[in-house]
Amino acid sequence: MILDDLKLNQKIKVVDIGAAAIAETPVYKSLVDLEIADLIAIDGDIRQKQSILSLYNEKVSVISEFISDGKEHNLYLCAKESGMTSLLKPDINALTFFNGFQIFGEVIKTEKINTKKLDSLENIGSIDFLKVDAQGSELNIISNGEKRRFLFNVFLC
């Protein structure tokens, strides 16, 4: 395997913001399965926690926080299975462009929540691979991670 040639002296640290385990297999899953990477999965939608733990057979640390700018926001809760819960109100016209997505983006509840900045998360340290899937809030998340921004080796939005 090509990873054997890398001769890593420590595990790769993967952080996934918006880690809801829905339809697709994350690109880093095999690294976690092979115990080459440690995964920190961050998803503020507490309904997602058990499916994240199940997907990784407990080889994951889950942080149930919404990451943004550290301020209060409206949270637009959509069906758990859709993974579309967001700090941004879904635009039904835009979602209709994608076949069936207007159903996924249907808001079932709105509530006020407090967010945290990426920089305020303790015990994460440097990040080798950052994946962010936050329904349009990706730039806001990265912008509020100034202390960590230059510690990313790879990031994927």
Give the location of each predicted region.
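Phosphate/nucleotide-binding beta-alpha loop and adjacent structural elements of enzyme active sites
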Residues: M1-C157
